[in-house]
């Protein structure tokens, strides 16, 4: 159905003039598939009239709320400039993320200006390693088959296509409706979803992390 108008929630939010601009997280596994490799890059911006000192403190919490990794760095940022801070950690015996066991950690990023907290940004993190590599079994032409592996284990995708549509609400899909769809998918032993034919709402991806669904995204 072709519908016009605003289809998703619209938000207005404010940040301090000295705040977090963007961040990038990489959370994978080493060759043992047991230990986590955590990388965080944070862009801090300063829109104040004068230079300032900004500190970024990150904490990584497990499901019980225990801090398993934390670090902080401070940068002197001139007016209207952006500075990138980088963090790298190796974490032993992490709880890995798969569709069967979607273990998530909570990342908290705290921005401080001269010791005072400006903002705290939360983000969910899952440790998994994705590989596409050949196996011993060969095709009729003699070439080896190539398989998808998650955390060292071969994976068979069993999924569905999904449109951002509901018979009652049109293209406006609430979190309640998303959760109902995801619960039906899991009840039918599905582990993946293909988005037709556009990116979904941000909350959709967060719930895929929570429920344990691999996402075949489209743009």
Q: Regions from the language model: what does each represent?
A:
Residues 1-202, 207, 211-215:
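Secreted/periplasmic carbohydrate-active enzymes, especially glycoside hydrolases
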